[in-house]
């Protein structure tokens, strides 16, 4: 009997999340006009995994939701974003995980790994801050690596193209899943975790290079983006 009640509770836990996602979909599609490239083909996105992306705009979490529209994606949100009752309601409804950047607690760590182990999808921006001044990605922190390692889930690298204007179309490039345990072993040291973070950073830089190669090819050949996207999909 308790199990049935638990399942029913789980169902309604995501009611507002799904409501906001569905009702906001049209607005997001018109405003963001998302476009996604898969250099290596669309990755397997079943089960739990972590999304690692660069942080280049305030609406990056929304762009990620549009990129992985068929999954519920949960993001980390700093505690200062919960400054009003309305904000708290919104972020709690979207099932965000509240964190303190100055003092990342074990509770936040355990909540992230718990959801990953349950097959959920967590999005993390490992630069640790919003990077609006440079197209170059900042060094990645190893905390995301440790959480993915603890939950034994892959990391899917994503490069978000920084927009020049707020109304620009949002473009994302999705790479192949990365198994961090294959990089740093079963019982990693701090140095091995940092090395794994560098590998993820490198993979996202490769996605950035891929995007610019497509953009340059587009400009050189006078192709529109849909033609280029078709070529990418065939590879």
Label every PLM stretch briefly.
Residues 10-32, 88, 92-95:
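Short hydrophobic helices that act as membrane-entry/anchoring signals
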Residues 36, 90-91, 155, 174:
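Structural signal for hydrophobic
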């Amino acid at each position: 009997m308790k199990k049935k009640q638990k399942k029913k509770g789980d169902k309604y836990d995501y009611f507002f999340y799904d409501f906001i996602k569905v009702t906001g979909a049209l607005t997001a599609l018109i405003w963001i006009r998302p476009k996604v490239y898969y250099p290596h083909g669309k990755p397997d996105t079943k089960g739990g995994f972590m999304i690692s992306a660069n942080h280049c705009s305030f609406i990056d979490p929304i762009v990620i939701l549009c990129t992985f529209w068929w999954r519920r994606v949960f993001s980390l949100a700093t505690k200062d974003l919960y400054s009003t009752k309305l904000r708290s309601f919104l972020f709690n409804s979207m099932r965000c995980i509240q964190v303190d950047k100055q003092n990342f607690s074990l509770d936040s760590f355990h909540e992230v790994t718990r959801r990953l182990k349950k097959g959920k999808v967590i999005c993390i921006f490992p630069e640790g801050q919003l990077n609006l001044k440079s197209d170059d990605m900042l060094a990645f922190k190893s905390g995301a690596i440790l959480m993915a390692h603890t939950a034994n889930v892959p990391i899917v690298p994503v490069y978000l193209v920084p927009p020049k204007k707020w109304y620009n179309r949002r473009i994302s490039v999705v790479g192949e899943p990365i198994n961090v345990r294959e990089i740093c072993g079963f019982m990693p040291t701090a140095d091995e975790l940092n090395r794994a973070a560098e590998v993820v950073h490198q993979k996202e830089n490769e996605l950035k290079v891929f995007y610019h190669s497509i953009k340059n090819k587009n400009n050189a050949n006078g192709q529109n983006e849909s033609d280029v996207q078709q070529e990418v999909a065939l590879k």
